[in-house]
Amino acid sequence: MFEGPLQDLIDELSRLPGVGPKSAQRIAFHLLNVDPTDITRLQEALGGVRDGVQFCRICCNISREEVCRICSDSGRDGGTICVVEEPKDIQVIERTGEFSGRYHVLGGALDPLANIGPRELNISTLLQRIGGVLPDRELADSTPENKLFDATPTVREVILATDPNTEGEATASYLGRLLKDFPDLVVSRLASGMPLGGDLEFVDELTLSRALSGRLQI
């Protein structure tokens, strides 16, 4: 154990995902030896994330504006919505060049062990985008007033692109049941070939591109 600010820094770095005590210690000692201007830039970047990043009021993606660039792009196909767990998943799909529709970010996946249920995810806003009504009263009660908006009547298909693990599959199954209440809406899931038990961000672009183009209706 070190003392003072150094140990405080190590402790805070250790709280980051994927950073263990040894990695945190290496990062901390690296920061001790970098130019002060680099530290200043890091501080400014951290402050910018805290103060300059918000979530799109339509799709819940990370955005600098009230509406993100994808939702604002009239060239995107508003009739197809790809549902993902996290904003980082959008970047993975965009790199394939296979999808030209719009997205909806759930903000996670169903996980009863972590007390994450439908009310903790951005499901109610997804249902409103599609049909403007909430068939599940519990979801309706959980919708913040400032997130209400008109439905997009042109939505033809919803692609469920949650992670191919236990939580992601449970989330896709739950959404599939909910979305069956909307007439004339096609609900599809990424095709087989995705590695089971993994995260979408680690799937290579070719595999993901094939999974998108060969998606299966559910």
From Swiss-Prot:
Keyword line: DNA damage, DNA recombination, DNA repair, Metal-binding, Zinc, Zinc-finger
Keyword flag Metal-binding: yes
InterPro entries: DNA_Rcmb_RecR (IPR000093), Hlx-hairpin-Hlx_DNA-bd_motif (IPR003583), Rcmb_RecR (IPR023627), Rcmb_RecR_Znf (IPR015967), TOPRIM_dom (IPR006171), TOPRIM_RecR (IPR034137)
Pfam families per record: RecR_C (PF21175), RecR_HhH (PF21176), RecR_ZnF (PF02132), Toprim_4 (PF13662)
A molecular-function term among this protein's GO annotations: zinc ion binding
Domain Toprim: 79-195
Gene3D superfamilies according to UniProt: 3.30.60.80, 3.40.1360.10, 6.10.250.240, RecR Domain 1
Keyword RNA-binding: no
ZnF start-end (C4-type): 56-71
Gene Ontology biological process terms in this record: DNA recombination; DNA repair
Family: Belongs to the RecR family.
Name this protein carries in UniProt: Recombination protein RecR
Organism of provenance: Corynebacterium glutamicum (strain R)
Source lineage: Bacteria, Bacillati, Actinomycetota, Actinomycetes, Mycobacteriales
